């Protein structure tokens, strides 16, 4: 049996971060939205017992058991007693380690495919597996615009009109940011202050965009401020970093305005290792079979590191 789906990228239009908790995690309140940009994920289920394999053509460093997609398949097999071979093939379009959720989305795509292949209808169990794999994975089981709270596992659907974006991703190891680093920088910058998370709001406007991780990350990675300036200079109504970065993005009034800005910025950064993409937020990617996880799932998770 072979199944295929799209694993959409995401951006955090809003990311508010609380103080560290006793368990080492940070509580968040984040407005996450999927994009019309995504990876293609193929999952093949064999008839005989055997291993999980994972290949990412053109990106051999992503092959194998350490890929989140492979981990998701292994946890699915353990939870539901599956022994048959599972082959995963991922055609990557989402930049890697970019704050766009590519790895988490691939993992959720595999879970969606396997749930269909084996007729699994236990949504709570699937959400628990997703949370074991990573904090962002439950969001991608839907996925649709949602407020993510707790560690990211408590999801509340959100009304987000289509937003026309330009994504700017610096493909430079010197600008890479691990999520754990970003949270540590934020904690250090607060100097012991423990701010409360602001409430959710009913409808998104660009003026509400914001990311608590951005100020400390800009201090540690100053070139990101230059990229944000390019977006503002080309008419972005808001420009922020997505997640823990290093991708930054701007919102624009229309798809045409975003496309023009993307072309101009691409010309301005042609001599640098920078990827520029125009994208639009969606209520649901047409290539995704929906699977909404419950509001919460009680399960261990992986810490941000």
UniProtKB/Swiss-Prot annotation:
Gene3D superfamilies linked: 3.30.230.10, GHMP kinase, C-terminal domain (3.30.70.890)
Pathway per the UniProt entry: Isoprenoid biosynthesis; isopentenyl diphosphate biosynthesis via DXP pathway; isopentenyl diphosphate from 1-deoxy-D-xylulose 5-phosphate: step 3/6
BP terms from Gene Ontology: isopentenyl diphosphate biosynthetic process, methylerythritol 4-phosphate pathway; terpenoid biosynthetic process
Disordered as annotated region, ranges: 286-305
Pfam families found in the cross-reference section: GHMP_kinases_C, GHMP_kinases_N
First-tier enzyme category under EC: transferase
Example of a GO MF term: 4-(cytidine 5'-diphospho)-2-C-methyl-D-erythritol kinase activity
InterPro entries given in the database record: GHMP_kinase_C_dom (IPR013750), GHMP_kinase_C_sf (IPR036554), GHMP_kinase_N_dom (IPR006204), IspE (IPR004424), Ribosomal_Su5_D2-typ_SF (IPR020568), Ribsml_uS5_D2-typ_fold_subgr (IPR014721)
Compositionally biased region (Low complexity): 290-305
Catalysed reaction, written as an equation: 4-CDP-2-C-methyl-D-erythritol + ATP = 4-CDP-2-C-methyl-D-erythritol 2-phosphate + ADP + H(+)
Top-level taxon in the UniProt lineage: Bacteria
Annotated EC: 2.7.1.148
Binding sites annotated in the UniProt record for ATP: 95-105
Entry-linked SUPFAM superfamilies: GHMP Kinase, C-terminal domain, Ribosomal protein S5 domain 2-like
Protein keywords: ATP-binding, Isoprene biosynthesis, Kinase, Nucleotide-binding, Transferase
Active site as annotated: 10, 136
Function: Catalyzes the phosphorylation of the position 2 hydroxy group of 4-diphosphocytidyl-2C-methyl-D-erythritol.
Membership in a protein family: Belongs to the GHMP kinase family. IspE subfamily.
Record-given protein name: 4-diphosphocytidyl-2-C-methyl-D-erythritol kinase
Organism: Anaeromyxobacter sp. (strain Fw109-5)
Lineage, opening ranks: Bacteria, Pseudomonadati, Myxococcota, Myxococcia, Myxococcales
